[in-house]
């Protein structure tokens, strides 16, 4: 039986030479790539791999809880 789909918040950061991504609701689930497109693909794979590992270890899969919001400031 296939589980329901989940949507996790992914934070993508641009560094001096690459992009990094992490998932706040899945501690340790990270990816890095040379482009935004690459890091988006890699974090998708990392999330799937992370969840597979949790299930294989008999651990619960965390429900997505994190959200994001932009805040306007006068600068």
Indicate residue ranges for each PLM-predicted region:
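Short, charged, surface-exposed hinge/linker loops at domain edges
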Residues: 1-8, 37, 41-75
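Structural detector for hydrophobic anchor residues on beta-strands
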Residues: 8, 19, 29-31
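Proline-centered helix-kink/hinge sites
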Residues: 24-27, 62
């Amino acid at each position: 039986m296939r589980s329901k789909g989940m949507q996790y918040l992914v934070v993508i950061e641009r560094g001096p030479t690459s992009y990094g991504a992490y998932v706040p609701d899945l501690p340790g689930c990270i990816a890095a790539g040379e482009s935004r497109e690459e890091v988006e693909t890699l974090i998708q794979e990392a999330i799937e791999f992370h969840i597979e590992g949790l299930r294989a270890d008999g651990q619960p899969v965390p429900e997505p809880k994190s959200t994001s919001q932009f805040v306007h400031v006068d600068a």
